[in-house]
Design a protein with these regions (language model features):
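Terminal beta-strand-rich extracellular "head" domains
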Residues: 26-27, 33, 38, 49-161
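Glycine-rich, low-complexity segments
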Residues: 1-31
Length: 161
């Protein structure tokens, strides 16, 4: 279906801002526990095949995360395009309280990628536990026992330049 604007142009012919070409969404409710500073694959993945090599792909992620520590710890999150890391944050969810408590969050980040291809791309999230200290540390995706409806969502949107 083509949407036409008041001036007679359509989504595909109007000049100006980027246009949305396609959207692909995936989600995961699989619980992941990260125990080391080595990044581990998750099933939080989405596949998209760009229609033009000049188009960009906007990745949007909503994550259900938790950190527990008797001292301090953090959850590291990394975004891959295929096997290449294109974004990471070793302190995405940081627990710095010197007390044995759980800190749970639903959080969001975006990354605008320029993949320069028309082949299928797999975007994937990895996780790791960072800021290792004395005592007990735990870092999780999808570990929110009081609300089982939480999960991680990843969205890939192809956009014209």
């Amino acid at each position: 279906m083509t949407v036409f604007f008041g001036d007679g142009t359509s989504q595909t012919s109007a000049a100006g801002a980027s246009k949305l070409v396609q959207t692909v969404t995936a989600n995961s409710k699989t619980q992941y526990s990260f125990t080391s500073t080595s990044y581990v694959d998750t099933d939080v993945t989405v596949n998209i095949t760009p229609t033009s090599s000049s188009n960009k792909v906007l990745i949007s992620c909503t994550l259900a995360t938790q950190c527990y520590a008797t001292n301090s710890t953090s959850l590291g999150v990394r975004l891959l395009r295929g096997s290449t890391a294109i974004w990471n944050n070793n302190e995405y969810h940081w627990h710095s309280v010197n007390a044995a408590i759980n800190l749970s969050y639903s959080s969001f980040f975006q990354y605008l990628d320029t993949p320069n291809t028309t082949s299928q791309i797999t975007y994937k999230l990895q996780g790791a536990r960072y800021r290792v200290s004395n005592g007990t540390q735990q870092a999780y995706f999808n570990y929110i026992p009081s609300n089982s409806s939480h999960g991680c969502i990843i969205i890939a949107q192809e956009m014209t330049p």
